[in-house]
Amino acid sequence: MLTWFLFYFSEISCDPPPEVKNARKPYYSLPIVPGTVLRYTCSPSYRLIGEKAIFCISENQVHATWDKAPPICESVNKTISCSDPIVPGGFMNKGSKAPFRHGDSVTFTCKANFTMKGSKTVWCQANEMWGPTALPVCESDFPLECPSLPTIHNGHHTGQHVDQFVAGLSVTYSCEPGYLLTGKKTIKCLSSGDWDGVIPTCKEAQCEHPGKFPNGQVKEPLSLQVGTTVYFSCNEGYQLQGQPSSQCVIVEQKAIWTKKPVCKEILCPPPPPVRNGSHTGSFSENVPYGSTVTYTCDPSPEKGVSFTLIGEKTINCTTGSQKTGIWSGPAPYCVLSTSAVLCLQPKIKRGQILSILKDSYSYNDTVAFSCEPGFTLKGNRSIRCNAHGTWEPPVPVCEKGCQAPPKIINGQKEDSYLLNFDPGTSIRYSCDPGYLLVGEDTIHCTPEGKWTPITPQCTVAECKPVGPHLFKRPQNQFIRTAVNSSCDEGFQLSESAYQLCQGTIPWFIEIRLCKEITCPPPPVIHNGTHTWSSSEDVPYGTVVTYMCYPGPEEGVKFKLIGEQTIHCTSDSRGRGSWSSPAPLCKLSLPAVQCTDVHVENGVKLTDNKAPYFYNDSVMFKCDDGYILSGSSQIRCKANNTWDPEKPLCKKEGCEPMRVHGLPDDSHIKLVKRTCQNGYQLTGYTYEKCQNAENGTWFKKIEVCTVILCQPPPKIANGGHTGMMAKHFLYGNEVSYECDEGFYLLGEKSLQCVNDSKGHGSWSGPPPQCLQSSPLTHCPDPEVKHGYKLNKTHSAFSHNDIVHFVCNQGFIMNGSHLIRCHTNNTWLPGVPTCIRKASLGCQSPSTIPNGNHTGGSIARFPPGMSVMYSCYQGFLMAGEARLICTHEGTWSQPPPFCKEVNCSFPEDTNGIQKGFQPGKTYRFGATVTLECEDGYTLEGSPQSQCQDDSQWNPPLALCKYRRWSTIPLICGISVGSALIILMSVGFCMILKHRESNYYTKTRPKEGALHLETREVYSIDPYNPAS
């Protein structure tokens, strides 16, 4: 545990205390100022050695240090003890008694007139020494002399000629030869007047008894004094190593024997091994002297073979003249007793035999093999001829691994991450969904390091549609994307449709759609018009013609500036745009000038001044007290006159008045007004006027107010859109709707109009909401770029169904079946036919040893074809013509070119010299043929391999030449008829044999009997091997 006290001494501090192993770490805080006390405690099972407390002190008020080293913690061991500690000039405190065990402490006190130096308390440590500090020293306050030292028997010391032994003087003892010093060699005179140690003694030196000598004997010595010699000898089976004697000598104050010899066991090397046999000894360890080893032969290795032991069956481990282990005799050997076993010479393709070549081999003969460059040996490199006349293990094979097989487009193969494959390995190919495998799905690696058969290909599978098109891209499905899609002129690529196709794995094809390019309505021009009358977008290619309006009056006309016709085309981004800006209609004016004009009692409101040109206008205002008579604005016409005539400012005045009754003789002037559309005449207002000319008179003015309709009629089982409105002005429209379960009969919408009297009224009677089904008549549905498969008439009744089909090159968006509903509409809506993008094919694959007519064309339109051809010396396998389909794929895989080879027939049916049946020759190779003796060459002796795998000229024949004496025999005249008959018969037989020399199978006439004289090639790229 830690107890600490803190006293503050400015900023002076001690370093962190050292850690004590196996002690609890004392607690402290920084800085550690002088006066801090740390106390250590040990962990359980450990004993504290030293003072438990250390103090942080500062002697010079500049630096602070710990007053002592920390204690140590040692594991408790009561078997350890320490000798009695002696401190000259001092004594142990009471309570300290021997024996002193591990962890015991002793505290010393100095005698009077002595001062202690060092730690007064020490502990018995695990090393049986007192510590952790040295024993204290009690120094005399008044130094004293030590007494004279006595002499010792058989020894002497360095102080024999010293008169006084003062404090600090040291004396060293030594012994006579043959004696050893016992005790402290050097003692020192202390200030207390005492020697710091006991006087040593000299004892006669003797060696210990040599004891027993392992595996040998010792000749007993007469004494054990220094100089005595002992002798050693070994038992049988052991050999003395070292000197045979040892002497007692003194080394470093000890009497010891010089190096003794040892008796090493005599061992024989491991017994010799015997081929085809064994022994009872060890094959790796040495064998002790006297051991016996027995040899036996191996059992019969195989049927018909046995081993016989030749020589001594047992041998013993003994010694020779050099006392080393040797065997009593040579090891026997086992001889094989075999019958006449022979193995035929083994054959290996693509390799050779490294051993001596023989026609046959004897039992246990071995043969080693190697392979041709580039091939690897599979199996054992060496084989043995066994007792059955066969080779074991089997003859190896030379084979070459295959490199990674080629990848296929739109497909994958097994183990695609591997780069090398062992012979015999098979790889399976498969195609992506939407593609079909053409060829074998599995290829195999041959020992020649080639893949066979040829790699398959994945061709585009024909999509067998399942269900309708989808206009939203399917998620997490395989989709065969459309490539090289394009649209006809006037269309641009837009969104895609997706068709589910039949297959083991669901897959889709993408169908790119074409959107018709349209332009916005042609621009409107001032003072002119154009030939397009609709407000909808304009189809691509449409031509619009512009025209100007006639002149506003005689002598004035509009002139067209710009292109009269523009057409709808497309910009660089494929968007619809007009071929050029719209033209302008500008007024063509004559040289017109109107005279200046003034109005008496009035002023001009416009700022322009004379001269005035065509269509210039002038506005007038009368002075106060005057009323304008005529138009306030006049215009300069093309004939240099003002229209209308200039007005007058007359002095007269009128003021509105409320009329309750007018005088009977009143002069009333009616001012007529024309009410605008949507307004009606509802009354009059009066103004009282007075002037000098007419006196007092009255102006009657018509008043126009807006036309209002009454709220529209309500209907049963329905309502209209104006239910919340308060007023219904002229032109307002309301729509009627029926409640659910009712249908509307009559006009759906009513409009606020004026009747014959000019009052507001609704455009017709309100409709009705009826519950029974009405008579249904749906309009004839029309689909652009499509047609109906049924119902060609124009009227359709309730529940009639129409089936639509899109034209070739278009795809349907919507349902192909629609039904006539009771509300005279089609459900679902009438579909639309969207143009499909036309697909193109990418450049077809190139083939080794051949080419095609596609050249550098990057994209091929549907229907275009390419032709493949092979180089000279190669034949085409497959179709030469490929056609680009509307699906954007080629009609079939490309062909390949295989090398042209000519060969001799396998079955020659005769004897030939140097002829190899089945050997092949490359295109262009020429062979020279020669017949064996007894045959005659018929045909050309030289033939060349042609590009159709045929020889030209055909290979020559060797005709058998035999029975050349037949005519002579047949020409002999014989007197006897019997002899003549026999001769004739014999001649017929020989003639028959000449023309038809038979074997057991067929005539040999016409068979090849050739030998190849030489082979050369005219093709520099295909030299004959």
Curated annotation (Swiss-Prot):
Task: Give a single Pfam family match.
Answer: Sushi
Q: What happens when the gene is disrupted?
A: CR2-deficient mice fail to mount an inflammatory response when compared with wild-type mice.
Topology check: give the Extracellular ranges. 12-963
Q: Which residues form the Sushi domain?
A: 12-75, 80-140, 144-204, 205-265, 266-336, 341-400, 401-460, 461-516, 517-587, 592-651, 652-706, 707-771, 776-835, 839-899, 900-960
Q: Carbohydrate attachment sites?
A: 77, 113, 276, 316, 364, 380, 484, 527, 615, 639, 694, 754, 790, 813, 823, 851, 901
BP GO annotations: complement activation, classical pathway; innate immune response
User: Which InterPro entries does its entry note?
Assistant: SEZ6_CSMD_C4BPB_Regulators, Sushi/SCR/CCP_sf, Sushi_SCR_CCP_dom
Please report any disulfide bonds recorded for this protein chain, giving both cysteine positions: C14-C56, C42-C73, C82-C124, C110-C138, C146-C189, C175-C202, C207-C248, C234-C263, C268-C317, C297-C334, C343-C385, C371-C398, C402-C445, C431-C458, C463-C501, C487-C514, C519-C568, C548-C585, C594-C636, C622-C649, C654-C689, C675-C704, C709-C752, C738-C769, C778-C820, C806-C833, C841-C884, C870-C897, C902-C945, C931-C958
Span-the-membrane segments of this chain are: 964-990
Where does the UniProt annotation place the signal sequence? Answer: 1-11
A single GO molecular-function term is: protein homodimerization activity
Q: How does it sit in the membrane?
A: Single-pass type I membrane protein
Q: Which domain of life is it from?
A: Eukaryota
Q: In which tissues is it expressed?
A: B-lymphocytes.
Where it sits in the cell: the answer is:
Cell membrane
The segments annotated as topological domain Cytoplasmic are 991-1025
Chief location category: membrane
The record describes its quaternary structure and partners as:
Interacts (via Sushi domain 1 and 2) with C3. Interacts with CD19. Part of a complex composed of CD19, CR2/CD21, CD81 and IFITM1/CD225 in the membrane of mature B-cells. Interacts (via Sushi domain 1 and 2) with FCER2 (via the C-terminus). Interacts with CD23. Interacts with FCRL5. Interacts with CR1. Interacts with INFNA1.
What job does the chain carry out?
Serves as a receptor for various ligands including complement component CD3d, HNRNPU OR IFNA1. When C3d is bound to antigens, attaches to C3d on B-cell surface and thereby facilitates the recognition and uptake of antigens by B-cells. This interaction enhances B-cell activation and subsequent immune responses. Forms a complex with several partners on the surface of B-cells including CD19, FCRL5 and CD81, to form the B-cell coreceptor complex that plays a crucial role in B-cell activation and signaling.
Q: What name does this protein carry?
A: Complement receptor type 2
Q: Which organism is it from?
A: Mus musculus (Mouse)
